[in-house]
Every structure is written in C-alpha cells, then in structure tokens.
Amino acid sequence: MAAVQVVGSWPSVQPREAPREAIPERGNGFRLLSARLCALRPDDSSSARTEIHLLFDQLISENYSEGSGVAPEDVSALLVQACRLVPLNQNHLVSKVSQLIHHLLNRLQVIVDEQHLDFLLAYTISAIHQCSSWTHREILQALAALVYCNGSKCQKYLPELLGNTGLLMKLSDLAQSDPEVRRAAVHCMANLCLSVPGQPYLEEPYQNVCFQAFLTILQSPKSSDMDDITFCMLLQNALKGIQSLLNGGRMKLTQTDELGALLAVLKKFMFHGLPGLNIEMPTVLYPTPLPQYDGRTPIKPQQSESSASRPTLNKKKKSKVKPKKIQQGEEEEKESSGEIEAAPVTGTGRVNLHEGNTWCPSSLGVQSLPLDGSGAAEKDGVSSSFSSSSWKRVSSSESDFSDAEGGMQSKMRSYQAKVRQGALVCFLSTIKSIEKKVLYGYWSAFIPDTPELGSPQSVSLMTLTLKDPSPKTRACALQVLSAILEGSKQFLSVAEDTSDHRRAFTPFSVMIACSIRELHRCLLLALVAESSSQTVTQIIKCLANLVSNAPYDRLKLSLLTKVWNQIKPYIRHKDVNVRVSSLTLLGAIVSTHAPLPEVQLLLQQPCSSGLGNSNSATPHLSPPDWWKKAPAGPSLEETSVSSPKGSSEPCWLIRLCISIVVLPKEDSCSGSDAGSAAGSTYEPSPMRLEALQVLTLLARGYFSMTQAYLMELGEVICKCMGEADPSIQLHGAKLLEELGTGLIQQYKPDSTAAPDQRAPVFLVVMFWTMMLNGPLPRALQNSEHPTLQASACDALSSILPEAFSNLPNDRQMLCITVLLGLNDSKNRLVKAATSRALGVYVLFPCLRQDVIFVADAANAILMSLEDKSLNVRAKAAWSLGNLTDTLIVNMETPDPSFQEEFSGLLLLKMLRSAIEASKDKDKVKSNAVRALGNLLHFLQPSHIEKPTFAEIIEESIQALISTVLTEAAMKVRWNACYAMGNVFKNPALPLGTAPWTSQAYNALTSVVTSCKNFKVRIRSAAALSVPGKREQYGSVDQYARIWNALVTALQKSEDTIDFLEFKYCVSLRTQICQALIHLLSLASASDLPCMKETLELSGNMVQSYILQFLKSGAEGDDTGAPHSPQERDQMVRMALKHMGSIQAPTGDTARRAIMGFLEEILAVCFDSSGSQGALPGLTNQ
C-alpha cells in the first residue's frame, strides 16, 4: 500500500510522487470536509471540540483512491488549519490531529511544501514538549511523515531535534520507558536522514550523531518490556537510517572501529530469527585474513518442526486475505516472509540442508537438476536489484498471514525476515561506500571456508542462501555476495591450491583457494535446491561474477566442469531470465583466463551432454541439417582448417548460440517471455543478444575453435546487421570485429598458431567480400544510429592486411572512401572510430606507399586532432603516430620516390599539429611526441635547409625536451625519450653543433639518474647510446656530463621506493652498461682524463656490473641491447680496439688506465667462461 512507504518500513527512499492531475468527480468528499474545517474558528467549547473530532474522523475514514484529485497544497493547507484549531492543552485533539497528519500524508503520498512545513514542524515539536506522554507516539508518527524527504528543509529545527539534549535523542535513548515511543523517535531520525537528489544533505555532525544513535540501538539487546514485533520494527528503522546515511549522505566509514562495529551488527542481524541459528558476535569485527570465531549455539527445539525449519515438501501453505488498515507501513506490510515451500527436486529439498551437511556437488547428477522452475515460490517478487527502493516487494502470493492458529507465528517470521533483508541491504550500501581493499580485510567474516573435519562451518552469506526460508532474503544475500565478488580479481589472484603437499600452517593463498572452492560448492547446492525462478537467476548471476574473478589457472581442475555441467539444463528453462543468465554464465566461463584447456575440452563435449527437455520455448539443440553441415565453403577440408588437435567434434555452444540467434523458436512464447516483441518468431531479444555476446567471447578466447565456423558466423552477422533492431545490429558488428581481430592475431609474427592451422587468406577474402557485399556498408552510413556506425568502423578496421590487398579494387575503394567520408561526421563516437581505422589502414603494406592515400589520411587525421572531444583527439594522435611510422618504413625502402613526392607543406603542417598536441592531455600527448620523433627522423636534407623548417624543428625539439622533463605519466615520458632517440638517428640534423644539443642531452641525463620509473630510465639510457659519431655528442664537457650521469645512474640502479620497479633493475643496468661501452668506443683523447677520474672512484662498481652484463642473457627489453653474450663481448673488444687506436699525448696515463680496465674485464670474463679470445693481440697495441 502507498502508506507503507513513509513510516516504519523498508520499501523505498524515493520521494513520493505528486498525485495525478485532478479528476473532477473524485476528491469531492475531501473538498467538502476541508471547506467545513476551514470555516471553523478556534473555539474552546465542548461542542466545537466535538465537531472538530467528528470532522477529523471523517477525514481519516474518507476513501482516498489513487488519483483522487486532491492537490498537495490543499492537503498542506488543511493540516495547517487543523493545527490552528487544536490548542496544545487538548491532549485528545492533539492526538487526533497527529493521526490526521500521519494518515493524509501517507494515504495521499504528499510531501509538505516548505511554506507550510515550518508551521507544522513548530506545532508538532511544541506538542511533544507540552502534551502528555501518552500522545507522544502519535505526535512522533506525524513528525516522521512531515520530515519524510524534507530533511534539507528542517535545518533550523535540527539542533532542537538532534542536538545533545534534542527531543529525538532523548526519546530514542535506551532509558526511554515506552518502547513504542522509542521506536517512533528512531523512525523520525531515519526519515530525517533520507536524501533527495539535488537537495543539501544533513551536515556531518548530525550525520555522526544519527549514525551513533542507530548503531547503539543495533548493539543493544531487546529490553524486557518490548515485544518481538516492536523490536523488529525498531531494528528495521535503525538499519534504514544507516542505509540512508551511506547512500544519500555519502557518509564515509574511515575509522576501523566504526566500520568493524557496523559490520558486527550487520552480520548479527543478517541471521535474525533464522530457524535453528543463534549467533553471538563480538562488538567489533577487525580486519584479518584468518577465519573469525562465531560463537554459535543452536536454538533448542521449542517450536514445532514446521516452524523451526524449512516447511516440509508435502505441506501446503495456507493463506487468507484479511482486509486491514495498515498505518504508515510500520505496523504491517502487506507481505509475509515469503516462506514458500521448495518444489520437490528428486526427493531432496532445502529442508534437508542442515548445518552439518557436507553434500558435495560432485554427487549431483545433471538429471536431478530443476529444469522446471515452476511452483508457488516462482511468484515471489524478487527483483534482480535490491537497491534502497527494493525492500517493498508486495505480491498476491505474499498477501497476509495464515489463520489464527499460526497467524502470530507467521507474522513474527515475516518481521524477522524483513530485519534480515534490511541488514543485507544495509550491508550492500556499506560495501559501496568503502574501498574494496578495506572490504576484503573482512572476507573471512562473510565468505565460507572449507570446514575442518568434525567442526561446524562458520555462518556466512551462503548460510542464508542455503537455509533462509524467504526467497527474497536468499536473493538479497546473493546480491550482497555478488557485490563482494565484483572487482575481486586482484584479491582472489593470490589463491593457489595446485600443490598437495602438507604444511605446518595454512598459507593465505590456500585459505583463499578454499573459500573459492567452497563458494562453488555452496552456490551449486543452492542452484539444485532453489525453486524460485527469480532467485535461480540471482544464483546464476552470482556464479558468473565468481567465475569472472576466480584464478582458475592457479586452482585444481574440475571447478569449471562442475559449473558447466550443472548450468547446461538451465539453458532450456521456461523462464527467459534464467535462460539469459545461464548464457551469461557460460560467457563468463569462456572468457575467464582464456584459453583454458579444461574449457577447451568442455566446448568439445557432445551437443546432447547434460541437456534435457524442459518444454521450454527455446530452439532445439539439434538444428536443421544446414546448420549441422561441416563449415561452409570449399575451404575447410581442402585447406586443413579444423577444430584444434584435428578433432571433428563440433562445438555445441557455438551451434547453440547460432540457433538461438537465427532460428525461429519451436513453439509459442511462454508467459515469461512476454518481454519479447509481440508476434516475434525468434527468441526474446535479451536471449539473442546474450548468445551473440557468447559468440564474441568465444571468438576472442577460443578463436582456433571458432574459425571452423567462419563462414556460418559470417551469415549470422549479415542476418543480424540486416535486422531492424539496432541492438542486434550492434552486437553483430561487435562479433565481426572480434572475428577480424582473431584472424589478424593468427598472422602476427609472434602468433602461436601453426601456418597450417591459420584460416587461409583466400577464405578470409571470401569472408570479407561477403561482409562488404552485405549490410555492412549500409550500417556504416546509418547516421540515425551513430553507435552502430562507430562499431561498424571498428569492424572495418579489423580486416586482415593480407586479405585487404586481395579484395576487388571496388571493395578496397569502398572501404577507403567510406572512412574518409565518415571522418567529417558530427558525432564524436563515429569520428573517433574513423580516426582509429585510418590509423590502421596507413600501416597496410598495399596502402602505405600510396602517397595520395597517405596524404588524404594525414589531412583527415590532422582535422580530427583539432576536435573538441578528448577521445577523438586521442584516437587521432594514435593514428598520427602510426602514419609517421609508415613514413619511417617508406624511408627505409630502396625506392626514394615516396620521400620525394610527399608534400613538404604537409610535413610542416603535421609538425605544427604534433607540437600543439604535445601540450594536450596525457592521452593525446603520448602519441604526439611519438609522431614528433618520427617526423624529425623523416626530414630530408632538402627540408632542413629551408628557412621555413628551421624554426619548426627548433620548436619540435623544445617540445620533446619539455615533455621528457615534465612530471607526466610514465607512458608520455617513455615515448618522449623514445622520440628523442629517433631524432638522434637523423644524420641531417645538426646534432652536436645546434644550440639545442646540450638541452636535449641534459634532459636525458636528468631522467636516467632521477626518474622514479625505471622503464623511462631504460629508454633514456637507450637514447643516449644512439648517436654513432663522437662529434654528435658535442663538447668535451658535454661528453663528460653524459659519462658521469650514466655512472651515477648505474650506482643508483637499485634506488627506488616502489617495490614493483625492482624487476626492471637488471634491464636498466644492461642498458646503462651498453651506453657506457658505446661512449668508450667513440671517445676522443680529450675525453679520456674525465673517464679515468670516474673509473678511479667507481671502477670496481662499474666493472662488476659490466661483467654481469657480459655474462647474462637476454633481458627481454625492447631497447635494442645485444642479446647474446658473444655480441656483448664483441662490444667490449671493439671499445678496447678503439682505445688502442687513439693517439694520446706523450706521458698521458688515461688511455693506458682505461685499456687496463677493459682488459681486466675481458680477462675475468675469459677465466670464468673459458672463451677463446684474442687478448694478447689487443693488449700489444
């Protein structure tokens, strides 16, 4: 009922909607009574009091239906008039007017406007001060209705209500003798804490006052004078108050004791009234990775068997509808606890799942799974979202309590279930308000672990999922578990249980692995026992969340197999939501740590394995013959393209998803499919979309298996993109992009796919020809759906380059023309996707030497680089980087025609745009500096000689220097150092003589010695070793500064406060040693004294690191450091040879000292490795 929303119940924190537009024939009774009331004047006579009493009674008893035509302002005005007529010395009338305020505001769903609120608040507060205590409950109910969603307008009354001696603080105190008054006061506080979007919230001091008051109530035991139902309602109000503080007030729980105290009471009340369970909790839960003790004592069986456990399987629930007045939702909601018996499941129901039960999922055959989710429980209104507005789920199957003999017991269970639901929803708000790393400190308090032999399992969220009699509470618990699991991948990644050896203690990694295993076991148990379709959906979604985050590559096999085999029958379930969530779970399995050998085997199972007939509206799993055929095209047998390891077993999941997407369902749409389009012959849209998503995930993770269906999937994509539903079209385009990406990955040099296992190029050409002759071009030009256009652009950029060059010329031109045209789109999504696609095409071997195309692409990219959207500019900068990579590739080809024909003016324009982009956000800057480095490397002597280029070259190099030195993101500085190395590669630039030379070297030496990020240091050291001639390093002083900086960098190669940087130490030393040896091999006679001086001070340190450099293998860095020990040894020998060739002045000792240093290094290396080097010959020089 509408009244439930305001007082004492959980359903919604959303503001009450204003009544509908007035309907003339309705509300006449209210208007007549209102007119009579407004005609009265204050009068203390008994007849006047009697008349007011009668009018109030009539107003309360009036039948107000929805859309009664009563305006909110009329209600507010009437209440103000009523209060003016009632002096505060008339207790009975004050009580009656309080009932009127409470009744009208709730019944008519009115929020009092600010104009009248001030008067009414002042009146009710004064009434509490002046009237007898027996009236306080009604007055507080009126006050709760007034402040509902009006907290921001009550600021001036907050000190009087919530101050140290405030009314609500006193009346809600444990010392309050009347439990109903105490409960009503707490309810007022909870309503004050409700937030309204866009309105100011309670100030922080009042938030803290309310939070402590609610927490104290939850921590205090039930007083002897309070009955159980009132206690439950008190708990509900306190929980609702905390939930409102966390949701709307964005209250942050920063203190460990504060959070621990809240979690302790939430855990306690999650199990409130649960049959057969009574837990004692500590006052505070402290974060710990170890399981916490739950002092748990079973309740003695004082109740009958039917109430102490889940109802028996053959006993039917009685239900009678009793019309009752329900006040403000706090006395009673029209909802029972939802205790609805489980449908029989091969003789095993939830009633048998006692605490000591250790029933393993491995014992569950798929035949015992509930294929038909029918039963009374299916009508339960359990939504997939238990947000702050979800505690009100009233349905006809939960209407009232049973007859007199069990009515009180049933009512009690209903209120206890609401407390459990309230605690769970409050816990959900708590999870959202704290950081995940803080939450996971309490993992063991809420997540089950595997019990030791003979010891009971500690209570957890899974206890509720398995044993709570209310489907709504079970679904609430599952949603909380899902929220905990969401984003837990990093935390769970430490789990490891692949080894069986016993230890004297249980490592944290093993404990987490046990938790993951137990979650699988319990969730699969819950799935078998559950009869409510809505809760089944929640279980499957929770499993999907678990599967997405668990590290199966570090766990023992069979966990995924059990989930896989148990979920397969639910694909045929009668409820479409169950079917969709089942596909979501299968998608999670095929996407987690793909490819997993265990999943690969599961995908190759026979089609019929574990699937039963459930009279559902889903298609047959045995599709018509044309889907059973071997993958289409002359291709597959002739070109040896088959499923992995030569298996001829088709992938049943791909077959299933294809049939769901393209085949008509076999019978009429069931009631649960009502969400699908009227008269549709296909599966409901959510089902088809999920099937397309699973196909996309299969293409991403198991492409070797998916490619066998390439042409069939091409037909599926064409069908989807030809449909009217933009969502189906979009998912078809996503599948196309993933298939295209998979084909590209196969042809990459580092691909693990054997050449004979790749899809042959001619087959890929056939595939893309089908796409380009189909609905793809139409989707690219569908400006009404820009998201589809953008996705189609992404798909077009996933063409295999080898296949693109073999497409007919008209299809190639179509792709290029469409992309260049779409670059002018006004939609940012489309423009970003187009810019990226052009950045891919400029790398195609068949296009990169086409000067006209490269120039057109460059102009389009430069235009996008000036867009207002950061995303567009970021994509354009990436494409500009690719385009300049193409310039470098073309420069390295023997044919100079490209360089000669490429426009100098366009180069100038590109340099200016890249300089501007280097001042942009980091997303743009990182690729802008990359482009600058390539452009400066590409410049020819003919360009550099022109005066127009001199200034722009200087600006470009200054932009790079500035970026190297700036405190930008690591990727930006890394790219800037890389770009500087590219600049040094251009022999036409005046490196060594130009004024910017010293600035460039100083920037790099600063980075190599002091940058916090070791990858950036490595790249700067690599750049310092690029110049191939001594004169390019500049003066003797400059050379000495570079040498000394590298020696210092070697000394500081382990100095870091970030532990993660240590793994790059060896790579950094390798690169610095290479740079030092490079400098030795280029040094002139005037450079030697400085080198000698440094070696005298730090020679032992340098020698030890160079020896490590010579003896170590490849370090896996991409800086170009020689990988083989022989190459490294040769570098030192060449440096020694160069030293011997230097003509030093007579009496100079520096050359001899350095040669001795190098000879000693080679001698030590020779002794340790036994290599046959020609040391004597070099020494004699």
From Swiss-Prot:
Q: Where does this protein have compositionally biased stretches of type Basic residues? A: 313-325
Q: Which InterPro entries match?
A: ARM-like, ARM-type_fold, DUF4042, HEAT6
What keywords is this UniProt entry annotated with? Phosphoprotein, Repeat
Disulfide bond residue pairs: none
For this UniProt entry, the molecular function terms from Gene Ontology, in alphabetical order, are: RNA binding
Fetch the Pfam families from UniProt: DUF4042
HEAT repeats, residue ranges:
159-198, 452-490, 515-552, 558-595
**Tissue expression profile of the protein:** Amplified in breast cancer cell lines MCF-7 and BT-474.
Where, if anywhere, are coiled coils annotated? Answer: none
Q: Where in the sequence does UniProt note compositional bias of the Polar residues kind? A: 300-312, 637-646
Keyword tRNA processing applies: no
Q: Region Disordered: which residues?
A: 292-347, 371-390, 613-646
Q: Which Gene3D superfamilies match?
A: Leucine-rich Repeat Variant
Q: Which residues carry this modification: Phosphothreonine?
A: 618
Identify residues that carry Phosphoserine.
Answer: 336-337, 399, 402, 643
The function of this protein is: Amplification-dependent oncogene.
What does the record's miscellaneous section state?
17q23 region is one of the most commonly amplified regions in breast cancer and therefore may harbor genes important for breast cancer development and progression.
* Protein name per Swiss-Prot or TrEMBL: HEAT repeat-containing protein 6
Source species of the chain: Homo sapiens (Human)
